[in-house]
């Protein structure tokens, strides 16, 4: 009998017709049954006369399935056994305690993400370099696009395109004649015929991230386009959405981002986004994380289909500092996926220091939110992590990994901003409000040489000094009552107090 792990993928492969246009003229689906669940999912055409249906079981035990479709060979049946998960298989990420995340097996998930918009579309050498960096454990979520990207530093064509056809000539593209807005002439696509190889590349990336314990935050649509993918009509969009959902939804580490900078996609209206969201909710039986990302105006994150807020800063100076306000407003996890990138390009969204990006991560985390990384350093190869992946050159990734280690030590699940002085941000466990025995006092760009603390008489508190930049934790002893803790007098320090 076939076996698969709980939250793994069971795939049924069927031979069928290849004549005509199987993407629009044929269909296949399957129903999977066990004593605990009954799930029906759509399949997809994978090219060369092969049709596939994928399923992610949520329980252990015996399953049976039946496939049906528009062609005789689509009718089949079978069974398989689902075994206990192993290794880093903790299931899909879910919302936990309103503002936080946990895997389905209840293991806490503290998001420390990064952005590599077009890494799935790069040559093999760049792809391998990206994986080598990810192996260092800096991040546990990556944002990336299904469609290729047209933007500065992104004039090369991708390795594959999502549709059959030919692209506009890019040989004369330069920074001098680059435009965000193009008329799409010169492209010749058949938007009813997918290129399965393009989507297999995406699936390879999803699996490679999964093997490393990294969530795949898939950006389904985006505005940076010279090929016409951002201005397809509703029928073409629906065909695309259904195909993507059928192919990707069974992977446990998938998150759905309906769009990156949705407000720049002028051809799409509010009713379009709500339509895509409705389709996604109906067709994804696993209820993966769902959001939509802004350039300037936030989407209405109170919408019930949105599981978490995927935010880009709206102000040059103040953004993650609003985390507590947005938690209160939206009653959902706050994920700052774009807060400017470490780098040195000419634009302000891509030239902050590693120290500043690390500070923003800490400010978001201490307020009960989460943040995202990106890197945009100029280099002779014109390979920038924010889009292509490749090699990391910045100083923040190791500090972000260190922060994640601190977050995983939180009692209970998740932090929240607690009461503190005007010149500090104090984080306490969300589950332990109002009485807590755990506090992190973060001083950001302040440079105190000492701090005074007052605790009730008779209570003992273990004190640790955290240097968030040099990544050290120094034991400062056990104290009670009123006491003073010496600090080195430089930025990015924190003091952790734990009642013992």
Placement of each model-derived feature along the sequence:
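Non-catalytic, glycine-rich low-complexity segments
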Residues: 1-36, 41-44, 79-85, 423-426, ...
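Aromatic- and carboxylate-lined catalytic core of secreted/periplasmic carbohydrate-active enzymes
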Residues: 2, 342-345, 357-477, 485-500
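Active-site mouth of glycoside hydrolases
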Residues: 33, 87-319
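Solvent-exposed strand-loop boundary residues in beta-sheet-rich modules
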Residues: 34-36, 71, 467-471
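Extended acidic/polar, glycine-enriched regions
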Residues: 37-98
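Short beta-strand segments within Ig-like beta-sandwich modules, predominantly Fibronectin type-III
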Residues: 43-45, 476-479
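Extended substrate-binding grooves/exosites of carbohydrate-active enzymes
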Residues: 113-120, 167, 175-178, 193, ...
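Extracellular glycoside hydrolase catalytic/binding regions
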Residues: 239, 253, 260-395
């Amino acid at each position: 009998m076939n076996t698969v792990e709980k939250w793994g993928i069971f795939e049924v492969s069927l031979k069928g017709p290849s004549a005509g246009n199987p993407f629009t003229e044929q269909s296949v689906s399957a129903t999977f049954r066990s004593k605990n669940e009954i799930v029906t999912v759509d399949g997809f055409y994978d090219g060369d006369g092969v049709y596939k249906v994928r399923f992610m079981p949520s329980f252990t035990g015996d399953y049976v399935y039946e496939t049906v479709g528009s062609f005789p060979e689509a009718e089949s049946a079978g069974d398989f056994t689902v075994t206990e998960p192993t290794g880093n298989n903790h299931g899909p990420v879910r919302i936990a305690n309103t503002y936080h995340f946990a895997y389905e097996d209840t293991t806490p998930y503290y998001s420390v993400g990064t952005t590599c918009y077009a890494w799935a579309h790069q040559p093999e050498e760049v792809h391998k370099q990206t994986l080598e960096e990810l192996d260092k454990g800096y991040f546990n979520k990556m944002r990336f696009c299904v469609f290729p990207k047209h933007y500065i530093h992104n004039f090369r064509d991708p390795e594959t395109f999502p549709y059959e056809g030919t692209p506009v000539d890019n040989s004369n593209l330069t920074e001098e004649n680059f435009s965000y807005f193009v008329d799409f002439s010169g492209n010749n696509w058949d938007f009813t015929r997918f290129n399965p190889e393009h989507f297999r590349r995406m699936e390879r990336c999803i699996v490679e991230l999964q093997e490393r314990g990294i969530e795949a935050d898939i950006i389904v649509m985006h505005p940076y386009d010279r090929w016409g993918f951002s201005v397809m009509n509703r029928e073409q969009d629906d065909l695309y959405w259904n195909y993507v959902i059928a192919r990707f939804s069974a992977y446990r580490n998938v998150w759905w981002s309906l769009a990156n900078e949705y407000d720049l996609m002028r051809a799409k209206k509010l009713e379009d986004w709500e339509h895509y969201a409705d389709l996604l909710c109906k067709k994804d039986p696993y209820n993966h994380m769902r959001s939509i990302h802004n350039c300037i105006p936030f989407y209405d994150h109170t919408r019930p289909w949105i599981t978490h807020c995927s935010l880009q800063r709206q102000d040059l100076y103040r953004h993650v500092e609003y985390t507590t306000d947005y938690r209160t407003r939206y009653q959902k996890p706050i994920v700052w996926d774009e807060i400017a990138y470490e780098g040195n390009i000419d634009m302000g969204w891509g030239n902050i220091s590693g120290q500043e990006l690390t500070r923003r991560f800490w400010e978001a985390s201490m307020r009960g939110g989460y943040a995202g990384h990106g890197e945009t350093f100029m280099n002779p190869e014109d390979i920038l992590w924010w889009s292509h992946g490749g090699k990391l050159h910045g100083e923040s990734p190791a500090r972000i990994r260190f922060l994640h280690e601190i977050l995983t030590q939180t009692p209970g699940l998740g932090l929240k901003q607690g009461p503190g002085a005007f010149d500090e941000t104090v984080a306490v466990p969300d589950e332990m409000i109002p009485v807590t025995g755990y506090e992190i006092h973060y001083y950001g760009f302040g440079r105190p040489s000492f701090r005074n603390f007052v605790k009730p008489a008779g209570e003992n508190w273990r004190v640790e000094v955290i240097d968030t930049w040099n990544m050290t934790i120094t034991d400062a002893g056990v104290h009670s009552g009123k006491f003073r803790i010496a600090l080195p007098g430089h930025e990015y320090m924190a003091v952790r107090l734990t009642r013992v």
